[in-house]
Amino acid sequence: MRIHYLLFSFLLVLLSPLSAFTQSINNPITCLTKGGVCWGPCTGGFRQIGTCGLPRVRCCKKK
């Protein structure tokens, strides 16, 4: 039974840094620091990595 507690604590420590990578981009400053640009639709060689806080304004980054 003690192995369950060890396994749970190991997984908790192992997976806790993943929350830092799943934070959404939702303002222009974060978009720029992540290497993106605030633009309307992401076209051509760009992909959407978040939003810039306004409706229809997306944070786009080159593919």
Curated annotation (Swiss-Prot):
Protein's cellular compartments: Secreted
InterPro entries xrefs: Defensin_beta-like
Modified residues (Pyrrolidone carboxylic acid): 23
Tissue-wise expression: Highly expressed in lung.
GO-annotated molecular function: CCR6 chemokine receptor binding; chemoattractant activity; phosphatidylinositol-4,5-bisphosphate binding
Matching SUPFAM superfamilies: Defensin-like (SSF57392)
Disulfide bonds: 31-59, 38-52, 42-60
Example of a GO cellular component annotation carried by this entry: extracellular space
Source organism superkingdom: Eukaryota
Coiled-coil ranges per UniProt: none
Signal peptide range: 1-22
The keyword Thylakoid is annotated on this UniProt entry: no
Gene Ontology annotations of biological process type: antifungal innate immune response; antimicrobial humoral immune response mediated by antimicrobial peptide; cell chemotaxis; chemotaxis; defense response to bacterium; defense response to fungus; defense response to Gram-negative bacterium; defense response to Gram-positive bacterium
Keyword hit for Signal: yes
Protein family: Belongs to the beta-defensin family.
Name of the protein in question: Beta-defensin 4
Organism: Rattus norvegicus (Rat)
